[in-house]
């Protein structure tokens, strides 16, 4: 599952450097397709422009990319990484649905969890750490329906539940796994009692 936002705790510049290296391997028209429509393109670039004007730093700009390969028609955006995003920016509060990742910086783990929980959406969250205690805190406190530890949240296969919390919730059940079977199951409750008195009571 793609992540829309990274909340970095402490010194994360070395992680961002690696992200830039990997993101540049995504080539529009070669191994990165276009967004679905002109409206989507304008919406996504609008998020980027607003964040830039509000003081965020564009580390990798995917606007107006050079498109390689034969499939050049389409609304292409290259991978985009935006640092120093703040919670008052629209890009931090809404779903982008594009090749864009926003980086929000937090002073410590408590602040990072507060940032995650302040978001109205709660589909999934992931934590990357070598501390079992920190991982446990995120698993227990993050307001999300799916949690990944040292792995980007995998979209589960049918036997596992898939669903979020808050504004990402589908309803009373997840769309896969046991609860999806329960959703489509029509329950019937039957209560029985058998004893010798049944032969002589007033309803026999």
Report the location of each language-model feature.
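Conserved C-terminal structural/oligomerization subdomain of aldehyde/semialdehyde dehydrogenase
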Residues: 8-9, 24-28, 69-204
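Terminal amphipathic helices with adjacent charged low-complexity linkers/tails
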Residues: 12-18, 22
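Aromatic/hydrophobic pocket-lining residues that form π-stacking "cages" and hydrophobic walls in ligand
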Residues: 19, 47, 135-138
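Short secondary-structure junctions
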Residues: 25, 55-67
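Short beta-strand to alpha-helix junction loop
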Residues: 35-45
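Short beta-strand segments
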Residues: 36, 59-62, 127
């Amino acid at each position: 599952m793609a992540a829309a936002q990274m909340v970095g705790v402490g010194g994360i510049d070395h992680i961002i450097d690696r992200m830039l290296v990997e993101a540049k391997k995504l080539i529009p028209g070669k191994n990165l397709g276009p967004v679905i429509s002109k409206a989507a393109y304008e919406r996504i670039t609008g998020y980027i422009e607003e964040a830039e004007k509000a003081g965020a730093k564009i580390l990798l700009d995917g606007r107006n990319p050079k498109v390689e390969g034969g499939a050049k028609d389409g609304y292409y955006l290259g991978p985009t990484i935006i640092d120093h995003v703040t919670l008052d920016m629209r890009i931090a509060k809404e779903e982008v649905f594009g090749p864009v990742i926003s980086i929000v910086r937090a002073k410590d783990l408590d602040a990072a969890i507060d940032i995650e929980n302040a978001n109205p959406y709660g589909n999934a969250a992931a934590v990357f750490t070598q501390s079992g205690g920190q991982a446990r805190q995120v698993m227990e406190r993050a307001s999300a329906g799916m949690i990944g530890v040292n792995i980007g949240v995998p979209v589960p296969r049918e036997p596992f539940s898939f669903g979020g919390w808050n504004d990402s919730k589908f309803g009373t059940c997840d769309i896969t796994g046991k609860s999806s079977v329960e959703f489509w199951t029509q329950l019937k409750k039957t209560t029985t009692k058998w004893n010798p008195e049944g032969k002589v009571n007033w309803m026999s």
